[in-house]
UniProtKB/Swiss-Prot annotation:
Protein family (similarity comment): Belongs to the AIR carboxylase family. Class I subfamily.
Superkingdom of this protein's organism: Bacteria
Protein name: N5-carboxyaminoimidazole ribonucleotide mutase
Name of the coding gene: purE
Keywords: Isomerase, Purine biosynthesis
InterPro entries: PurE_ClassI, PurE_dom, PurE_prokaryotes
GO MF term list: 5-(carboxyamino)imidazole ribonucleotide mutase activity
NCBIfam families: purE
Amino acid sequence: MKVGIIMGSKSDWPTMKLAAEMLDRFGVEYETKVVSAHRTPHLLAEYASTAKERGLKVIIAGAGGAAHLPGMAAAFTSLPVLGVPVQSRALSGLDSLYSIVQMPKGIAVGTLAIGEAGAANAGLLAAQILGTHDENIMAKVEAFRSEQTESVLANPNPAED
């Protein structure tokens, strides 16, 4: 495994699966797990503190509401932690964004956008991080970026379909 995708509850999976799909696109191995900062704090501590020895290189943590999962995961590991604020009914995920982005100096969490775009970009960013030491992954990331450019250039007029 290279990437761990964790989320506060199973209800976060529809959002977090976009991170998994992005990693699939680049052929990056990952594991998924529900780990609640509030309901299973000891499991979270064990998961994050053993992540490096289990072969993980990056952790993607998605959470809604109080969204303490990414910050607490970062507190227990020296690996990069990417935080995804999951969009919620209350406050549309803005509360989660503030929770994840406002980390104290010395405990870093790379915070992505709220919701599906954030989850997909977390997968992309994890692949880019891994790609700095894996030419195969980086080649796939670069091909993806080229495909995006080509799709825009192929359809420059929004009035045409």
